[in-house]
Design a protein with these regions (language model features):
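Conserved N-terminal phosphate-binding loop of PLP-dependent enzymes in the Aspartate aminotransferase
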Residues: 1-407
C-alpha cells in the first residue's frame, strides 16, 4: 500500500476515500453496522436528537428505552448498565464478578479477545500445554502478577476446560467466553457451550458471554438466542449503539446489584462522563427497534449470504489447491491461510503471513476493503449482486497471488 487510506464518506455497502475511490466495505465499522453504512433510522434519530441537545450529564428517558430493548432481547438480562466501549463493559463486568463472589480469578479462553484493559490483555503462552494453557500478558506495561495471579486461561473447544474449572472453582469468580470467537468464527459450538454452562452451574462459578461483537449480529438475541443458553453476565457493544460508541454490562439482578448496592450487595465503583450519551442512546434505540421489527428478514439473509461467501471461496481454494479457508459465523468471517483443520486459535499458523499481507493488498486493488485485523463482516446492505462482486474479488486476488509466485 503506497499510503494510508482515509475515508471521506460511507453509504450502504460502500466506503469512499479522500481520492474518490469507492470500495465494497467488509469492515462494517468493525462490526456495528449490521444494516449498512448511514442506516436511515439511525441518521434520522441522530438528527432529531442533535436538535434537542447532545450532552447533558443527567439521565434521560432514552436510557430507559434502550435498556428495555436490551432486556427484551434476552431472558438472561434483568438489568443494564451503560458505558462507552466494549473494553469498559468487560472491565466493569470482571469487577462486578469479583465483588459479588469475593473471589479473585477470572478465566478467559485461548484465542479470545475482550478489550484493551489490563485484565483483558492476557493470552495463552504459545509454548504451554494446549489442554492446560498458562497465562502471559499481551504487550508491555502490564504487571506480570495480573496474568500469573489474577487471570487464568482455559482451552477453547476442549473439554479439559471443564476439569480446570472444577479444579480452580474455589478461586474462580468468573468464566468469560466469546460464544463465537472473533479469531475463529464458527457456529458449531453448541455442545461445548452447553457443557460450559453446566459445569459453571455445578461449581457455582459465574458465566459471562462477551457478546460485544456477536450481540445483535448473529441473531437479534445474539448467541444467547442462537444457542438457547442463559449466562449470568453479558457484555454488549458495537451493534447495540448503532455505530455510536457504546458498552453495555447486563445480567441477572443478583450480579447487577453490585452496581447499585441493592440487597446489601458489595458495591463497585462505576461511572463515566459520557455513559448513556444522548446521541448513542438515540442511535441504539433506532437500530434495535429496526432490527427487532425486521429480524425475520435480516438475520436469515445475513446467514445465507455469509455462508454463500464462505462456501464459494472454500470450494475455489480446494479446487485450486490454495492453502486457505474461509471460516464464518453467519455474517462475520475470517480468511485463514492454512489448509489444516482448525479447532482453535492454536491451529492457526502465521507462517504464511507474507502471503496473507499480499492477498489483502490485491483485494484492495479489486476495490474490496477488509479491516487490518482481517475479521470481515457483511451487512444487510450487501445485496446478492454485491456479494457476487466480493466473491469474484477474492478469487481474482488468489489468482493474482499465483501469478506473483506466492502460491
Amino acid at each position: 500500500m503506497p499510503h494510508q487510506i482515509y475515508i471521506e464518506s460511507a453509504e450502504g455497502p460502500y466506503l469512499t476515500d479522500l481520492d474518490g475511490n469507492q470500495y465494497i466495505d467488509l469492515t462494517c465499522g468493525f462490526g456495528p453496522n449490521v444494516v449498512g453504512n448511514r442506516a436511515q433510522p439511525v441518521e434520522e434519530a441522530l438528527a432529531s436528537q442533535i436538535k434537542k441537545g447532545w450532552h447533558f450529564g443527567i439521565p434521560g428517558a432514552e436510557q430507559a428505552r434502550l435498556a428495555e430493548l436490551i432486556k427484551e432481547s434476552s431472558p438472561a438480562v434483568d438489568e443494564v448498565m451503560f458505558c462507552n466501549s466494549g473494553s469498559e463493559a468487560t472491565m466493569f463486568a470482571f469487577r462486578a464478578a469479583r465483588a459479588l463472589t469475593g473471589k479473585r480469578v477470572v478465566a478467559l479462553f485461548d484465542g479470545s479477545y475482550h478489550g484493551i484493559h489490563d485484565y483483558a490483555l492476557v493470552k495463552a503462552s504459545n509454548k504451554s500445554d494446549r489442554s492446560e494453557p498458562t497465562s502471559s500478558t499481551l504487550g508491555a506495561g502490564i504487571p506480570e502478577e495480573i496474568s500469573k495471579d489474577l487471570m487464568m486461561m482455559l482451552p477453547y473447544r476442549d473439554e479439559n476446560a471443564y476439569e480446570l474449572i472444577r479444579k480452580h472453582k474455589d478461586d474462580l469468580a468468573l468464566v468469560v467466553i466469546e460464544p463465537v470467537q472473533s479469531s475463529n468464527p464458527r457456529l458449531d459450538n453448541q455442545q461445548f457451550l452447553d457443557g460450559l454452562r453446566a459445569v459453571c452451574t455445578e461449581c457455582d462459578v459465574l458465566l459471562m458471554f462477551d457478546e460485544v461483537i456477536t450481540g445483535f449480529r448473529i441473531e437479534y438475541g445474539g448467541c444467547q438466542q442462537y444457542y438457547n443458553i442463559e449466562p449470568d453476565l453479558v457484555t454488549y457493544g458495537k451493534a447495540a449503539g448503532g455505530g455510536m460508541p457504546i458498552g453495555v454490562v447486563a445480567g441477572s439482578k443478583r450480579v447487577m446489584n453490585t452496581f447499585s448496592g441493592a440487597d446489601d450487595t458489595p458495591t463497585i465503583f462505576a461511572g463515566g462522563t459520557f455513559n448513556g450519551h444522548p446521541l448513542t442512546m438515540a442511535a441504539g434505540i433506532a437500530i434495535l427497534e429496526h432490527l427487532k421489527k425486521n429480524q425475520e428478514e435480516i438475520y436469515p439473509y445475513l446467514h445465507e449470504q455469509g455462508n454463500r461467501i464462505a462456501s464459494e471461496i472454500n470450494e475455489f481454494c480446494t479446487s485450486n489447491n490454495i492453502p486457505a479457508q474461509m471460516m464464518n459465523a453467519g455474517s462475520m468471517m475470517h480468511l485463514i491461510f492454512s489448509g489444516e483443520e482448525i479447532q482453535s486459535s492454536r491451529d492457526i499458523s502465521h507462517s504464511l503471513y507474507k502471503v496473507e499481507k499480499e492477498f489483502y493488498l490485491h483485494l484492495l486493488g479489486h476495490n474490496v476493503i477488509v479491516p487490518g485485523i482481517h475479521l470481515a463482516f457483511i451487512s444487510y446492505a450487501h445485496k446478492p449482486e454485491i456479494v457476487d462482486q466480493v466473491i469474484d474479488a477474492f478469487k481474482k486476488s488468489f489468482e493474482d497471488l499465483r501469478e506473483d509466485g506466492y502460491l
